[in-house]
């Protein structure tokens, strides 16, 4: 049961990456507003951390069933570890960093969009291809 939920979470994250990539390329102003909204309140900060932790755990649980278990494990552990680090940082510091970093990233929005599309597609492919080249689910 938990593996099925983890698989669904990772699939939803992949679809999110595809949607973010498409929005970044087709409606960049809307994508920019969305990205600028992160970490601007304590609630959003902790919601982001909870989401990152959940997604990291889902990648770790899904890794054995994916085409690239090593990549899924590394990505999952990176999310879990950086989330733990962000838990130690006051949300105002995270907010200050986001106010600086997001506008810098938005200068490269077409690249962010294309990368997001590719990442989402690769995650979906790795999920549904599975570790032995067959369906992963």
What is each model feature region?
Residues 1-17:
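Hydrophobic transmembrane alpha-helical segments in integral membrane proteins
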Residues 9-12, 39-52:
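A loop-to-helix transmembrane entry motif
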Residues 22-40:
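Membrane-interface helix-loop junction between the first two transmembrane segments
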Residues 23, 29-30, 54-66, 89-93, ...:
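Membrane-helix exit/interface motif
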Residues 48-59, 112-120:
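Core segments of transmembrane alpha-helices
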Residues 66-88:
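Short alpha-helical packing/oligomerization segments
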Residues 84-98:
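Transmembrane alpha-helical segments of integral membrane proteins
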Residues 123-137:
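Juxtamembrane boundary at the C-terminal end of a transmembrane helix
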